């Protein structure tokens, strides 16, 4: 089937290990309910009708993915990821076919809301550079003194946002910006930072703060609570 300008391919970098979780199992393969975190994250993407394919970049030699139902899903493509997130995303982009726009979503961010995703996807009609889901900073922010656990000063939180995923960009633009940034040794912490490095200004689309990334052991119980609450709300 030919791809239309409205069709979107999602890329999920899932080659990381997540040492802060303090488990032998990579965090994306930990379970919440009867599914892994990765499955929750991918199913949230596929629930939107514009997302026609999901490319998952896994670590070479990963034996866990093949045991999941996702391995046989007709809309899933699997590629080998790289040592760094940006390498995995580039590998995913190369497998994204002729999709004009791509979503990049964290493998360990299972609590994505469909209305947030829908608002983000409207950027393909209104923006040339795309944007990201993000949440305004509401806590008081402190900057530490270099090398010390001591407060240097309070940071003005006005205009500060927590970057979330998915992040949504024209495929060719993201590919070119990631390639240039990596070739020039820039520090790339997310896909938006590659566009920033190349002089672009992606938009911020406000999303829910409960769209958390499972990073530490305590995040697992919190994500389970959020998912259970969401399922209950959708069924009532």
From Swiss-Prot:
Gene Ontology biological-process entries: isopentenyl diphosphate biosynthetic process, methylerythritol 4-phosphate pathway
Transmembrane portions of the chain: none
Keyword Cell inner membrane recorded: no
InterPro entries for the chain: IspD, IspD/TarI, IspD/TarI_cytidylyltransf_bact, ISPD_synthase_CS, Nucleotide-diphossugar_trans
A GO molecular-function annotation: 2-C-methyl-D-erythritol 4-phosphate cytidylyltransferase activity
EC number in record: 2.7.7.60
Pathway(s) where this gene product acts: Isoprenoid biosynthesis; isopentenyl diphosphate biosynthesis via DXP pathway; isopentenyl diphosphate from 1-deoxy-D-xylulose 5-phosphate: step 2/6
Coiled coil regions, renumbered to chain: none
Entry keyword annotation includes Nucleotidyltransferase: yes
Catalytic activity: 2-C-methyl-D-erythritol 4-phosphate + CTP + H(+) = 4-CDP-2-C-methyl-D-erythritol + diphosphate
HAMAP family, per the entry: IspD (MF_00108)
Quaternary state and interactors: Homodimer.
UniProt protein name: 2-C-methyl-D-erythritol 4-phosphate cytidylyltransferase
Organism field: Escherichia coli O17:K52:H18 (strain UMN026 / ExPEC)
Gene: ispD
């Amino acid at each position: 089937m030919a791809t239309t300008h409205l069709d979107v391919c999602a890329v999920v970098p899932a080659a990381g290990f997540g040492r802060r979780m303090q488990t032998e199992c990579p965090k994306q393969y930990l379970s919440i309910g009867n599914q892994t975190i990765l499955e929750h994250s991918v199913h949230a993407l596929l629930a939107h009708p514009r997302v026609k394919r999901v490319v998952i970049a896994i670590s070479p030699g990963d034996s866990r993915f093949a045991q999941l139902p996702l391995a046989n899903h007709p809309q899933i493509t699997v590629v080998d990821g790289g040592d760094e997130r940006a390498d995995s995303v580039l590998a995913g982009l190369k497998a994204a076919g002729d999709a004009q726009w791509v979503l990049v979503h964290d493998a360990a961010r299972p609590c994505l809301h469909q209305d947030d995703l829908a608002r983000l996807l409207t950027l393909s009609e209104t923006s040339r550079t795309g944007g990201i889901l993000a949440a305004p900073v509401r806590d008081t922010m402190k900057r530490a003194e270099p090398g010390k656990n001591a407060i240097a000063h309070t940071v003005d939180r006005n205009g500060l946002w927590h970057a979330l995923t998915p992040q949504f960009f024209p495929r060719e633009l993201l590919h070119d910006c990631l390639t240039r940034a990596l070739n020039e040794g820039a520090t790339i912490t997310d896909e938006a930072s590659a566009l920033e490095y190349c002089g672009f200004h992606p938009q911020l689309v406000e999303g829910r703060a409960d769209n958390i990334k499972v990073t530490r052991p305590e995040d697992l119980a919190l994500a389970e609570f959020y998912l259970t609450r969401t399922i209950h709300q959708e069924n009532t």
